[in-house]
A protein has these predicted regions:
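Short, solvent-exposed loop/turn and secondary-structure capping segments
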Residues: 51-56, 76-78, 126-131, 151-152, ...
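Short, solvent-exposed turn/loop segments enriched in Gly/Ser/Thr/Pro and often Arg
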Residues: 99, 119-125, 145-147, 152, ...
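Alpha-helical packing segments of well-folded alpha/beta enzyme cores
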Residues: 13, 52, 85, 128, ...
Length: 476
């Protein structure tokens, strides 16, 4: 019998051990299969990809390959900051193999790669992550976890089936104050929860356009076919990539998809809800091509152990109140700085600037922002006088760093990253139901979670599970 283990099987052994009784009986590092430097493939090398790779290497990974649709080595002078970031990544990892197609890289490198970071536009998250997980590779994927609702369900399912270690890129999830607030809310510091309110001033990119911009010549350094990938074709224009794809239904998920995995995180995590019962959207400016200029979304959830007896709602607000799409300059023009936010009755004079959350319970409120001074504030009634402050129940991430937590999960020193796909998948699914509701404003949609259908609206199924371009199989 051959007892020799490959580096891939070492990592799989580590994950399997920690996922079971190893939690109670620590296993020596050598038995867990600790790797000196786990190897990583960076999918999406510029912009957020630069930060993800920096976080991964700081945690202890070795970058051996990069996949990006922009080959900066084919460019002359570089002025755009996102293109500059790609050049900086290539310079930082000069020995890393580079290709535009991550599928080819994964196939060619095989077991030489232990893990991947996925830092692409939203419409590539599913294919890159699923292929990696099915190949036994650990995955760190940027938010939102997926572009589509069915995709989010599948990501959580495949992560569980393969047993690889996963983490979604909502970095504040690793902050101590975030985890302490989850513990306090669950312990009842504000009583049973009735409402959650979250908001952002985004979009800060173009949304609300009625047709694509004119086609322009594709720069020689860009593999535009690979950028489009599984999504519907549109001719290249710099108004689409590298940044403004967020404002396209086919490639991004608007301000809601871009920011809710950050800002809704505290409320959703604290409540540990099942699927929402209903969702309804109010919005302004959505078109066939683009999400709205501003919106308000409300999800209704059934009662659980942390909620009031009637259940609870999550309420989302985005966008500037007085804004319009400027086609000539391909941007949003706003008048004034007022953006959608909760009522004064909710805020009670608290100003958390461009984003924030308020959790409303039967005995008080918790005001929260993701970082900075006074990151959370309690406003309670006399109920808090007899409140028993809970012991810590959630693990704390080393250095409050979600890259480090993911690395530690792979190495077997912690059981998992706390933003694992088993949590991130259902949260993303909930958020993307809100994105779907933006397409049919004013209509309360009833969600049948077991069948993944909107009750009475079969025609909306195409937005729940999208079709892919030839060559991009949904089964990978």
């Amino acid at each position: 019998m051959n007892r020799q283990l490959t580096r891939r099987s070492f990592v799989k052994v580590a994950g399997a051990a920690v996922g079971s009784s190893a939690l109670l009986h620590p296993v020596p590092l050598i038995a867990r299969g600790r790797l000196e430097k786990p190897t990583i493939l960076g999918i999406g090398a510029g912009g957020k990809g630069k930060a993800d790779l920096a976080g991964a290497t700081k945690a202890g990974f070795e970058v051996i390959a990069l996949a990006d649709v922009v080959d900066v080595k084919k460019l002359g002078s570089i002025t755009d900051k996102r293109t500059k970031s790609m050049a900086q990544v290539r310079d930082a990892y000069p020995q890393a193999r580079f290709e535009s197609d991550y599928r080819e890289l994964m196939a060619d490198l095989g077991d030489k790669v232990d893990a991947v970071t996925v830092s692409t536009p939203d419409h590539h998250h599913f294919h890159a992550s699923i292929k990696a997980m099915k190949s036994g590779k650990h995955v760190y994927c940027q938010k939102p976890l997926t572009h589509g609702i069915w995709e989010a369900r599948m990501m959580a399912k495949i992560a569980e089936e393969t047993g690889v270690k996963t983490q979604m890129g909502n970095q504040a999830h690793a902050n101590d104050h975030m985890r302490r607030c989850v513990e306090l809310i669950r312990a009842g510091v504000i009583g049973k929860v009735k409402e959650i309110h979250t908001w952002t001033n985004r979009p800060i990119w173009a949304q609300g356009f009625a047709s694509p911009p004119p086609a322009t010549k594709v720069p020689k350094a860009i593999d535009w076919k690979q950028w489009i990938g599984p999504a519907p074709w549109v001719d290249y224009n710099p108004a689409i990539a590298p940044f403004a794809w967020r404002g396209w239904w086919n490639y991004g998920t608007g301000a809601l998809g871009d920011m809710a995995c950050h800002i809704m995180d505290l409320g959703y995590w604290s409540m540990n809800p099942g699927p929402p019962e209903t969702v309804v959207a109010e919005q302004s400016g959505a078109t066939e091509f683009s999400p709205p200029i501003n919106s308000k979304i409300t999800w209704e959830f059934s009662p659980n152990e942390y909620s009031s007896k009637d259940g609870f709602t999550i309420n989302w607000y985005d966008g500037y109140v007085n804004a319009s799409f400027n086609r000539e300059d391909w941007k949003l023009d706003k008048v004034g700085n007022e953006y959608n936010h909760p009522s004064e009755e909710v805020l009670e004079g608290m100003d958390f600037e461009k984003f924030g959350s308020v959790i409303i319970g039967e005995h008080g409120k918790l005001f929260f922002k993701r970082s900075g001074k006074n990151a959370w504030v309690l406003k309670t009634d006399t109920h808090v006088d007899g409140f028993q402050w809970p012991e810590k129940s959630l693990p704390r991430a080393a250095g409050e760093d979600n890259y480090q937590e993911w690395y530690d999960a792979i190495q077997g020193t912690v059981s998992r990253g706390e933003s694992h796909f088993g949590l991130a998948g259902p949260m993303t699914e909930t958020i993307l139901l809100g994105v779907l509701a933006q397409r049919v404003p004013g209509e309360t949609l009833k969600w049948n979670a077991s069948k993944m259908k909107i009750v009475g609206r079969p025609e909306l199924g195409k937005f729940i599970r999208r079709e892919y371009s030839p060559g991009w199989d949904s089964t990978i």
